[in-house]
Amino acid sequence: PGALQTLDWLNQQRVPCAWLDELGGADAERMASPLPGWIKAQHCTPAPWPAPDACWHALMTLKTGTLDGCVLVSGEPRLLQSGLNAGLWTIGLATCSSLCGVDRQQWQALSAQEQERKRGNATLQLFALGVHSVIDHLESLGDCLADIAQRRLKGEKP
């Protein structure tokens, strides 16, 4: 939830963004089709995740001059590991990740207790992976990016 609104906010803030996936051809195009045109889509890199190649390739496409402040946001553990391997800040998406094992409709049908259990398990697994922050969904990204900015001001590195 909140993905398109968050992307609009990032665009207003002039934050360059890329979409990374491992799909090729028509599948990749179908997955990226709802995204705004200003988002650079990256498909199929020579080395599969968790190699850092996809992240570095995306940063080169975005013409990023430094890794400082670059953030990867995903619910996919292998892509998050790729971001960690590339030296990026990483934010894991708990409730909309493959770690929860349900789609949005199934999630909404779960009891509050079952949602909390799945959210907690996904959060623990994401932190065990080594991500820097975990949020439930993209609607919380602004606050999370502000937190990372404060951590960077204190000298913390990914």
Tell where the protein language model's regions lie, with residue ranges.
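Active-site substrate-binding loop(s) of clan PA
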Residues: 18
